[in-house]
């Protein structure tokens, strides 16, 4: 402590405070987190020590850097980390006053967060408290993930204690189901929704309503200025079934994020785009729709081949300013992995050219899926009622006391420790990475049983399928409305009429509409300027 000079207190929590300090020798600013140990039980003290040990073992450019740590005469534990001049993401959103961030900036933040989260999961670490106030920003607007007070090393396949911030908790935690790394993906999805929309993904006046919204994965539409690809990625992170959520590594390999991944300083070769060799260009190719876990085969008929060729030409634009250039390649029998260098201006131009094609590809798949699969309305209503049924079991001191006012709007970090560990079965949850060590987590409240239980939490696969079909219909409608709005704004009335023709009295098949719309989008005109962003 003698090496540091305290400048001011910059934060206060339930168990300690944060101070801005200056290293006397280096004359460099750091943040010192001081955790009170006096009058705390042994489990809490072990948690503080293990947080210090965990921070010392982490090393990633997008995680706050550990500087020093010690125990001050047994009364408090001190952890010194790097100082981020840009504040936290929650403050940045408030200062924006409703002015939305540019998509390029959001995607850059998103990629950095995924790199940090993938690093944690590869090292068997669950963060368990991902929220905007724990996402810090440097003066260069780069991400630093912070606050590992609730983090856990997975000794078993899954965790079972209920910890975190209610607004960012995933359905399986609230349903008292053992959870794994996909719980962090849900929390990050909530953060990304808040960064995009400048409002929480899930917000309610009371805990029961909040749980109901989370259990139904009921979110409002995101701002229309962002691309469908980005919004679909965020939606995929907020799927109720954890098995249907992507991992951080899978998201990093998404084609839409590849340009931003190439700009990162810790880009691993396993995340670089995979390009097929020339010998395979004529074969059938399998592609994944942006922001979705469903696969579709691109058939070798005239219209689909034309669409695929146009998309490839638009992405692989090679003019005076090179969009993508190969730096080094590692050859394999079927494909080669290529590192890429990116020109941001050329990248934006190329994405502008293929924006209509990408949107059409999503509409085509969703419309064809809905046409082929008819939905029984009675089953649909039953599935919705089943997924929205909530049973809240109050426990004294766990969530809210009877005499207290409703939960305030600000976020509250809660935790309920289960005394008896449940036997974890692999087939009841998504697979996760094996662990070797266990970090006991001390939380604010403890109870023999969890405070929140959801009825009908063990949904059958058939119910998941029905809900997925409903989600597909919603995605298709949203994509269709976005395209119609864009065509109307550009006064492309003939194309707009072609899009809406299948819904008239003399409706034609979705396939005929897809072929017609493909031809009309082969040479898309230049889009008008987008709204001014920050």
UniProtKB/Swiss-Prot annotation:
Signal sequence, renumbered to the chain: none
DNA damage in keyword set: no
Subcellular location: Cytoplasm
Superkingdom, natural source: Eukaryota
Entry-linked InterPro entries: Kinase-like_dom_sf, NEK_Ser/Thr_kinase, Prot_kinase_dom, Protein_kinase_ATP_BS, Ser/Thr_kinase_AS
PTM annotation, UniProt: Ubiquitinated by the E3 ligase DIS1. Ubiquitination of NEK6 leads to its degradation via the 26S proteasome-dependent pathway.
Gene3D superfamilies: Phosphorylase Kinase, domain 1 (3.30.200.20), Transferase(Phosphotransferase) domain 1 (1.10.510.10)
Presence of keyword Isomerase: no
Binding-site list for ATP: 10-18, 33
UniProt GO BP: microtubule-based process
Pfam families given in the database record: Pkinase (PF00069)
Recorded GO CC terms: cortical microtubule; cytoplasm
Main localisation: cytoplasm
PROSITE patterns: PROTEIN_KINASE_ATP, PROTEIN_KINASE_DOM, PROTEIN_KINASE_ST
Name of the top EC class for this enzyme: transferase
Key words of the record: ATP-binding, Cytoplasm, Kinase, Nucleotide-binding, Serine/threonine-protein kinase, Transferase, Ubl conjugation
Catalytic site: 129 (proton acceptor)
GO molecular function: ATP binding; protein serine kinase activity; protein serine/threonine kinase activity
Documented EC number(s): 2.7.11.34
Domain Protein kinase: 4-257
Catalyzed reaction equations: L-seryl-[protein] + ATP = O-phospho-L-seryl-[protein] + ADP + H(+); L-threonyl-[protein] + ATP = O-phospho-L-threonyl-[protein] + ADP + H(+)
Region feature (Disordered): 278-306, 425-449
Tissue specificity field: Expressed in anthers, pistils and leaves.
Family label: Belongs to the protein kinase superfamily. NEK Ser/Thr protein kinase family. NIMA subfamily.
Subunit structure: Interacts with DIS1.
Name of the protein described by the UniProt record: Serine/threonine-protein kinase Nek6
The organism of origin for this protein: Oryza sativa subsp. japonica
Record lineage: Eukaryota, Viridiplantae, Streptophyta, Embryophyta, Tracheophyta
